[in-house]
């Protein structure tokens, strides 16, 4: 039988620890769409302490829906190197254009970003901005 007290305590303590460790950051990113996720990945990979805040339950923005509500997206040649770095499959459609499974793309960049050290907080709205010197 599962002990709900242990489950609740584990969730609350773990999340609180993650949140408290993110009170001082090098970079805070608002919005976990494709741009926010890639920015978080690149900054965390570079060794910065980064957290990403998303007001919705799910991250990835509209990319889940792909193009025309088909879960396929098209990227151009300039993005191919990043997709390769993220181990996301890109199939050549025609010269300079690649087709990518939208679900693989959102999932792939999310996993790589988290593994690089990005902390993601969904269901959090950001209302104020503080910029500190240095």
Sequence positions of predicted segments:
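Short hydrophobic core segments
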Residues: 28-30, 53, 126, 134
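Glycine-rich FAD pyrophosphate-binding loop
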Residues: 28, 44-64
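Conserved N-terminal glycine-rich FAD pyrophosphate-binding loop of Rossmann-like flavoproteins
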Residues: 3-5, 21, 56-79
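Glycine-rich Rossmann-fold phosphate-binding loop(s) that bind the pyrophosphate
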Residues: 31-35
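Conserved FAD-binding subdomain of flavin-dependent enzymes
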Residues: 42, 58, 72-93
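Feature captures the FAD/FMN-dependent oxidoreductase FAD-binding
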Residues: 87-134
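Extreme N-terminal leader/targeting segments of oxidoreductases
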Residues: 1-27, 112, 116
